Regions:
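Active-site donor-binding loop signature of nucleotide-sugar glycosyltransferases
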Residues: 13, 69, 109, 125-127, ...
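Donor-binding and catalytic core of enzymes assembling or modifying cell-surface/extracellular glycoconjugates
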Residues: 22-115, 120
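Leloir-type glycosyltransferase catalytic cores
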Residues: 1-2, 119-141
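Residue-level signal for pocket-adjacent positions within structured domains
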Residues: 17, 62, 127
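Short regulatory "switch" loops immediately downstream of catalytic or recognition motifs
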Residues: 13, 44-56, 133-141
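Mid-sequence helix-capping/hinge segment at a functional interface
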Residues: 1-21
Length: 141
């Protein structure tokens, strides 16, 4: 059953490593603002509204609705399957969105495009960090 009647988009702005995040200062705020101008509600479905260590912290983007929390997997699936599309990073929520068969815009760089599922909507810049995670000569521990 669809609980939210208005058109909406799900986003997930966090991942397991800071290098997997979209470290573009105003990037998420601009995306959320644009989507809202197009008439979408924007739901952030990360586990936590804030995460980080030391002096580097990531927060739910300004203007996004807080649907974070330790939700059962089925509740996240229900949110995703009724979304118009999903925007996220190289993370488990992106895979979950892909599994629900909605369009996924994947922002990546730390991993190579062939490390994840195929999506025609991939944001990937090969001029910065690209594929670092897939290079076995790098020690991330």
């Amino acid at each position: 059953e669809r609980k939210i009647q208005e058109p909406y988009v799900c986003i997930a702005v966090q991942s397991t490593a800071q290098a997997k995040h979209w470290n573009n200062g105003p990037g998420w705020a601009e995306v959320v603002s644009h989507l809202k101008e197009l008439g979408y509600r924007v739901l952030c479905i990360d586990r936590n509204a804030h995460s980080g260590h030391g002096f580097v912290w990531n927060h739910i983007p300004w203007g996004a609705e807080d649907f974070t929390g330790a939700l059962p997997l089925q509740e996240r699936v229900d949110l995703l399957r009724h979304a118009s599309f999903f925007i996220g990073l190289s993370s488990g929520l992106s895979w979950l969105a892909w599994a629900t068969r909605i369009p996924v815009i994947l922002i990546s760089g730390f991993t190579l495009p062939n490390s994840e599922f195929y999506t025609p909507w991939r944001v990937f810049n090969s001029h910065g960090c690209n594929g670092c995670w897939d290079n076995i000569t790098y020690n991330f521990d």
